[in-house]
């Protein structure tokens, strides 16, 4: 195996977020309020199963232990189960997760688990069906809830739920969410609304710091847990009276980037060193053939020398990210 991916600031990278499409069938207000609009990439332009097999093999060789499949909505790909199986071929990758809007969970989650999926994140921004419809543009709340139940029935011991925290939308609904997870092994993750190129006005109107929730959780006796090396950026809290957990993702907090352990590859094969960075490093020309793996690993390793110490969100610099469907949030 090649040496562990490490950047100039001694951060080690165990976690790959791999976007497999930027297409989504939801119209979430904070991401794609006007719906998906193709950006010159046809469905045939997204990474193929063989290309995904090659890129994840290279990352596995470079020490990656966890791969998260993102989008867009990953399950819109008809070959999604084959993609999971292709990633599963790498013994070094211990965790394969997906972030999904959940609309196909009930139908397909058992097949995904059989193919090798080990973790699920479902986006649920409200537990009120009408508000869910207003946020997502889809009247599928009950379908998504049934999908979460189906995930437990398929054998997943825990389901993570992502909730984008928005002032005057859901920030005051903590008790409703806590009641929901009291007897369910759900890790509910509140994600601070992040500014993107297309979402400046929404950010100014609805952003609220996750510190407000953290202070309230600590006041109620919730306990901050230690992170594992392949965990994502959430600060996780538990409570003896709850089966579920609470996670807080606060990208505007001081030193948020100090524990960065993840890299991103877009659905068209570009390596992105930061969600809010510029440009990206093209990998696709080295995904054509199995004989290119050594060169692929070398390019990935070399690119890390350019990773910045921190994002520049505090300076309102959102980089290339116009919306979160582009490289998977």
From Swiss-Prot:
Domain Radical SAM core span(s) in chain numbering: 8-234
Catalyzed chemical reaction(s): GTP + AH2 + S-adenosyl-L-methionine = (8S)-3',8-cyclo-7,8-dihydroguanosine 5'-triphosphate + 5'-deoxyadenosine + L-methionine + A + H(+)
Biological processes, Gene Ontology terms: Mo-molybdopterin cofactor biosynthetic process
Keyword 4Fe-4S attributed: yes
UniProt entry keywords in alphabetical sequence: 4Fe-4S, GTP-binding, Iron, Iron-sulfur, Lyase, Metal-binding, Molybdenum cofactor biosynthesis, Nucleotide-binding, S-adenosyl-L-methionine
Metabolic or biological pathway: Cofactor biosynthesis; molybdopterin biosynthesis
Residue sites binding S-adenosyl-L-methionine per the record: 30, 72, 123, 194
Binding site for GTP: 17, 68, 99, 160, 262-264
Cystine pairings recorded for this chain: none
Known cofactor(s): [4Fe-4S] cluster
CC cofactor note: Binds 2 [4Fe-4S] clusters. Binds 1 [4Fe-4S] cluster coordinated with 3 cysteines and an exchangeable S-adenosyl-L-methionine and 1 [4Fe-4S] cluster coordinated with 3 cysteines and the GTP-derived substrate.
Annotated positions binding [4Fe-4S] cluster 2: 257, 260, 274
Role of this protein: Catalyzes the cyclization of GTP to (8S)-3',8-cyclo-7,8-dihydroguanosine 5'-triphosphate.
PANTHER family: GTP 3',8-CYCLASE, MOLYBDOPTERIN COFACTOR SYNTHESIS PROTEIN A
Family of the protein in this entry: Belongs to the radical SAM superfamily. MoaA family.
Record protein name field: GTP 3',8-cyclase
Organism: Escherichia coli O45:K1 (strain S88 / ExPEC)
Lineage of producing organism: Bacteria, Pseudomonadati, Pseudomonadota, Gammaproteobacteria, Enterobacterales
Gene: moaA
């Amino acid at each position: 195996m090649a040496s562990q991916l490490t950047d100039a600031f001694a951060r080690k990278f165990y976690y790959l977020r791999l976007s497999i499409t930027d297409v989504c069938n939801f119209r979430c207000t904070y991401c794609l309020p006007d719906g998906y609009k193709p950006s010159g990439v046809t469905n045939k332009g997204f990474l193929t199963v063989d290309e995904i097999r090659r890129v994840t093999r290279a990352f596995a060789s470079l020490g990656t232990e966890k791969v998260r499949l993102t989008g867009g909505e990953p399950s819109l790909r008809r070959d999604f189960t084959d993609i999971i199986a292709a990633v599963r071929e790498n013994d070094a990758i211990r965790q394969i997760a997906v972030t999904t809007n959940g609309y196909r969970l009930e139908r397909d989650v058992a097949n995904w688990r059989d193919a090798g999926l080990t973790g699920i994140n479902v986006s649920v921004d409200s537990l009120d069906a009408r508000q869910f419809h207003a946020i997502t543009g889809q009247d599928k709340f009950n379908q998504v809830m049934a999908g979460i139940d189906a995930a437990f029935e398929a054998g997943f011991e825990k389901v993570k739920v992502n909730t984008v925290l928005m002032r005057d939308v859901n920030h005051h609904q903590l008790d409703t969410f806590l009641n929901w997870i009291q007897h369910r092994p759900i890790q509910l993750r509140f994600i601070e609304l992040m500014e993107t190129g297309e979402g400046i006005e929404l950010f100014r109107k609805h952003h609220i710091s996750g510190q407000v929730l953290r202070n309230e959780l600590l006041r109620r006796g919730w306990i901050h847990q230690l992170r594992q090396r392949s965990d994502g950026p959430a600060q996780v809290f538990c409570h003896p009276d709850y089966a579920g957990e609470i996670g807080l993702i606060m990208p505007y907090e001081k030193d948020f980037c100090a524990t960065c352990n993840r890299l991103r590859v877009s659905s068209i094969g570009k390596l992105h060193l930061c969600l809010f960075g510029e440009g990206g490093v093209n990998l696709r020309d080295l995904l054509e053939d199995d004989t290119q793996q050594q060169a692929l690993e070398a390019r990935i390793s070399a690119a890390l020398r350019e990773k910045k110490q921190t994002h520049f969100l505090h300076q309102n610099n959102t980089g290339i990210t116009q919306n979160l469907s582009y490289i998977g949030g």
